[in-house]
Every structure is written in structure tokens, then in C-alpha cells.
């Protein structure tokens, strides 16, 4: 019998993020406590989101609104890295980035967790920005998925191509 395997990836659905951004922009435009603060939210490039407001408190509230919309669209908070508010003239600016892909540092952490705490006979290998995990038994693969979901990593993980 051939080995069973799955891939560990860290990807976000850009369309869902765009929907969350549009919902947040609509709420910021219509909510009473944001009137007169010139609070805006928009894309800045491909992987960054920029929020602008007249006060730092309204800027933090706008970030909370955006995070709430992300959660409702089933996007992990680990995928959005909000920067620090920067004063810019009469306004405050915040640029948040979206994190995708598994970098080498996190790949090493995941491989170490699988090696140290996972069942014996499970092999993992890094393939670009994803990790392929394989084993003879499917139960071992399910144990690895449960182990990684319970671990405290600073990236959002998805498990795909379960064969």
C-alpha cells in the first residue's frame, strides 16, 4: 500500500479579504462614531492594507472593525499583521500586511514539532512554501494535524491534498 500524505500550506483567499475590506469600509462610512473622522481603509499594493484616520483611537477602532470582518469571512487573525499607528500630518496612518506562505524559520519549527512530538514513521519535507507530510497510516496523519492545530505557531495553517 502506498503512503498517505497531505500538504501544510499558509494561504489566504484574497477575494475574501477584499470582501472583508469592502464591508469594513462600508461600516466605517456609515457608523455614527466614525462621522467626521475621515477614516478610510484601502489596499496599498498587493499584500498591504492601509488605514487612515484623524485620531489614534478611531484608527484602533477601525482596525478592530476590519479584524471583526476578517473573522466573519473565516480568515485567521494570524494572517493579518497590523503595524503601529504613525502620525502623518493631521492624520494617523497604519499599514497592515497579509502573511502568506511558510518561511524557512516556521518550516523548521513545524518539522521539529512533527519529529519530536509526532508518531514514529511520519516523514515531512519542505517543498517551496509548503510542507509535505507522509506516513503509512492515515491515523498518524490525523494525529499530526491535531498536533499542529494545537501548537502555538504565529502563522495560519491549512491542510490540503489529503490522500
UniProtKB/Swiss-Prot annotation:
InterPro entries in alphabetical order: DUF520 (IPR007551), UPF0234-like_C (IPR035571), UPF0234_N (IPR035570), YajQ-like_sf (IPR036183)
Keywords attached to this entry: Nucleotide-binding
Gene Ontology MF term list: nucleotide binding
Residues making up the signal peptide according to the UniProt record: none
Cited Gene3D superfamilies: 3.30.70.860, YajQ-like, domain 2
Keyword Ubl conjugation assigned: no
GO cellular component: cytosol
Cited CDD domains: YajQ_like
Domain of life: Bacteria
PANTHER family: UPF0234 PROTEIN YAJQ
NCBIfam families: PRK05412.1
HAMAP family attached to this UniProt entry: YajQ
Task of the protein: Nucleotide-binding protein.
Protein name: Nucleotide-binding protein MAB_3912
Species per Swiss-Prot/TrEMBL record: Mycobacteroides abscessus (strain ATCC 19977 / DSM 44196 / CCUG 20993 / CIP 104536 / JCM 13569 / NCTC 13031 / TMC 1543 / L948) (Mycobacterium abscessus)
